[in-house]
C-alpha cells in the first residue's frame, strides 16, 4: 500500500483512500492534495514519486506544471490592476497596447481577453512552441492578425495565448513581465509557492509529468480552418514539453 504523508481530516478519509488507490494502481505516479474548508486547511497530503523513472519521493515542497490553472493566477494579476484603477476591462485593448488595433481588432476589449471571446484564440501564422517562448515576436504576431470571429460574439478557448494577450497588457501598464508582476505583487507578499517562470534554482524539486493517453475525441470533421483546430494545433503542445528548461523558465 502506498505511503501517504501529511494530514487528512477524518471527514476526508475517502479522499485519502482514492489517493492511495491511484498510487497503488499506477494511475498516478505521485501527487499532492490540499483542501481548504471554511478557511481551514483540512487536507494536506502527498505520496508517490516525482517521476515514473525516478524513485525519489514526492515531498511536501514538490511542485509540478499545472497547465491552465496558471490562467487563474494570470487573471488575478489583471484584476489586481483593476482594483488599483490601472486597468479597465471595458476599455479597448489598444488603450494599453496600441499595436493591437489592426485587422478588425480595434474594438476588442480587455474583458474579451479574460473571457475567451476576443476572436484571437491562437496564432494565425504557423508557430512552434519555440516561437511562443519568444515574447516579443509572438505578441507581435498576435497584434497583426485578424480575429477568427467577431470579437465578443462567441467564446473560444484561448488555450496557449491568453497569457500572451493579458500578459502583454500587464507589461504595457507596469513595465513588468506577467511572471515578474505576479511574483512581486502576489506570490511573495502572500508566501505562495506558485511560479510563472520558474527560477533554475527551483528545477530540482519539479515532478515530471507522465504523458496521458491520446484523446478519444476526433475533431478532424471540423476542418482545418475551424478556430478550435487552429487553436489547438498552433502550436501543438505535448505533455513532455513541460520538462524542457525553456518551458519552465517561460
Predicted regions and their residues:
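Terminal-appendage/accessory-domain detector
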Residues: 1-3, 40-42, 242-250
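Short, conserved catalytic-motif segment at the N-terminal edge
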Residues: 3-67, 88, 144
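Generic short alpha-helical segment signal, independent of protein family or function
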Residues: 20, 24, 47, 79-87, ...
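Short secondary-structure junction motifs
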Residues: 28-30, 84, 88-90, 105, ...
Amino acid at each position: 500500500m502506498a505511503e501517504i504523508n501529511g494530514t487528512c481530516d477524518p471527514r476526508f478519509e475517502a479522499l485519502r483512500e482514492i489517493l492511495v488507490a491511484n498510487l497503488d494502481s499506477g494511475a498516478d505516479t505521485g501527487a499532492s492534495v490540499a483542501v481548504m474548508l471554511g478557511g481551514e486547511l483540512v487536507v494536506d497530503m502527498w505520496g508517490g514519486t516525482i517521476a515514473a523513472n525516478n524513485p525519489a519521493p514526492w515531498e511536501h515542497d514538490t511542485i509540478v506544471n499545472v497547465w491552465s490553472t496558471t490562467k487563474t493566477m494570470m487573471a488575478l494579476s489583471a484584476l489586481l490592476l483593476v482594483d488599483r484603477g490601472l486597468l479597465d476591462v471595458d476599455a479597448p485593448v489598444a488603450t494599453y497596447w496600441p499595436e493591437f488595433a489592426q485587422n478588425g481588432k480595434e474594438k476588442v476589449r480587455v474583458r474579451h481577453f479574460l473571457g475567451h471571446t476576443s476572436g484571437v484564440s491562437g496564432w494565425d501564422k504557423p508557430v512552434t512552441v519555440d516561437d511562443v517562448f519568444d515574447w516579443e515576436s509572438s505578441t507581435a504576431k498576435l497584434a497583426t492578425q485578424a480575429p477568427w470571429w467577431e470579437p465578443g460574439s462567441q467564446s473560444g478557448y484561448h488555450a496557449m495565448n491568453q497569457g500572451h494577450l493579458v500578459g502583454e497588457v500587464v507589461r504595457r501598464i507596469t513595465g513588468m513581465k506577467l511572471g515578474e508582476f505576479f511574483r512581486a505583487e502576489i506570490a511573495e507578499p502572500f508566501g505562495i509557492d506558485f511560479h510563472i517562470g520558474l527560477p533554475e534554482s527551483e528545477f530540482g524539486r519539479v515532478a515530471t509529468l507522465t504523458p496521458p493517453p491520446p484523446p478519444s475525441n476526433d475533431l478532424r470533421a471540423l476542418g482545418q480552418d475551424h478556430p478550435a483546430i487552429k487553436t489547438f494545433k498552433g502550436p501543438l503542445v505535448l505533455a513532455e514539453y513541460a520538462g524542457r528548461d525553456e518551458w519552465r523558465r517561460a
